[in-house]
Amino acid sequence: MSGTLLAFDFGTKSIGVAVGQRITGTARPLPAIKAQDGTPDWNLIERLLKEWQPDEIIVGLPLNMDGTEQPLTARARKFANRIHGRFGVEVKLHDERLSTVEARSGLFEQGGYRALNKGKIDSASAVIILESYFEQGY
């Protein structure tokens, strides 16, 4: 086991990506993947898996603030199931509430409005999802 994990922040137009290390509990953004109505370029996902060889994948689970599911929740679950089905890697879902808000805030502090492009926000959200996963002791 390498201790490497990949995280995805699922979206219908853009999917944020982050890579992290379980040993250090740290994560960093990778370029976001464009999606068409939630469907990514699966060849790109396959390349990421071959390059990073993660022990597991974390997919952010979008929930309402009260913990109930929203329309995007089922699509994120389907995305996670497809990754597992196509590539056989272990996939876990992790609550992503407020990750996008936190990502926007952090990027804005670093570079104002210029830093707020969609791909950067989505991958920064994936970092937050993965760091939150580590913080919860997984």
From Swiss-Prot:
Family per similarity comment:
Belongs to the YqgF nuclease family.
- Domain of life, per lineage: Bacteria
Where is this protein localized, as stated in its record?
Cytoplasm
Q: Name one Pfam family in it.
A: RuvX
Keyword tags: Cytoplasm, Hydrolase, Nuclease, Ribosome biogenesis
- The EC designation for this entry is 3.1.-.-
Give a GO biological-process term.
rRNA 5'-end processing
Please name the gene that encodes this protein: yqgF
Please give the InterPro entries that the UniProt record associates with this protein: RNaseH-like_sf, YqgF, YqgF/RNaseH-like_dom, YqgF/RNaseH-like_dom_sf
Keyword Cytoplasm set for record: yes
Gene3D superfamilies annotated for this entry?
A: YqgF/RNase H-like domain (3.30.420.140)
Q: Name one GO molecular function term.
A: nuclease activity
- Name the job this protein performs: Could be a nuclease involved in processing of the 5'-end of pre-16S rRNA.
Instruction: Output this protein's name.
Output: Putative pre-16S rRNA nuclease
